[in-house]
Structure formats: structure tokens, C-alpha cells
Amino acid sequence: MDTDLAPSVEKAAAALKAGGAREPGEQLRSLLSELRSRFEALYGPRLVRLMLFGSQARGDAEPGSDIDVLVVLEGPVRPGKEIARTGEIAAGMSLENNVVISCTFISADQFEREESPLMINVRREGVPV
């Protein structure tokens, strides 16, 4: 695993463990690292960042809670198109790890400028992956 990612992945693993999720920390680290690698291979330099958000990032997840990931991309983003492009990756990893991975897609410009409740919370509570 990239050492630059290690602290972020460790923080995400601790948040999941603290939230009562069924995933052991090592499995979460592996899942997040694999998700990032697959998205980097798919998007290349267009991938700006991945952020874990929601109950898992806050540490108040319950057993069975999903893993919410914000995917920030350079350039225009059509969420439906991105869901179609990544659906097989997310579904396969969800089945392999017995957890639901939910991806939300947004452009880098929107991430920086949008003031929706979701973006405010992601900026405040999100964990970089």
C-alpha cells in the first residue's frame, strides 16, 4: 500500500471498527486500497480524490451499514454514466466483502464550490482514501 495513503486508510479502518461494522480493520484497508487502485486504473489522472463519508467515516455505523465513497473527478461528471462505468467494480467488491459500497460522483469544481448539506458534511467529516 502507498505509504501516503496509510494514515487515511488507518483512520477509515478505525472509524469502521468504532462504528461496530463487521469488517476487520485489515479487510477494510484492503477494500479501500483495492477500490482506489481500480478507480485509478479506470480514470487515470482524471481521478482527483476518494473520500469515505457517512456513518462509517463518523464512526457511528451499525452492523450492515454501507460504505459511502465520494468519487471526485476532473472535468464534467455525468453521475449515471460513471455509475455504469464503475458498477461492476463496486458490485463485485461488495459481493466479495459482504458489504454494500455506494459511490457518489462529483466534479472537482463542484466539490470545491457546492454548498449542499452533503458536500459540507463530506468536507467536514470525510476521510480521504
Predicted regions and their residues:
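Short beta-strand->loop micro-motif that forms the acidic, two-metal-ion catalytic signature
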Residues: 68-72
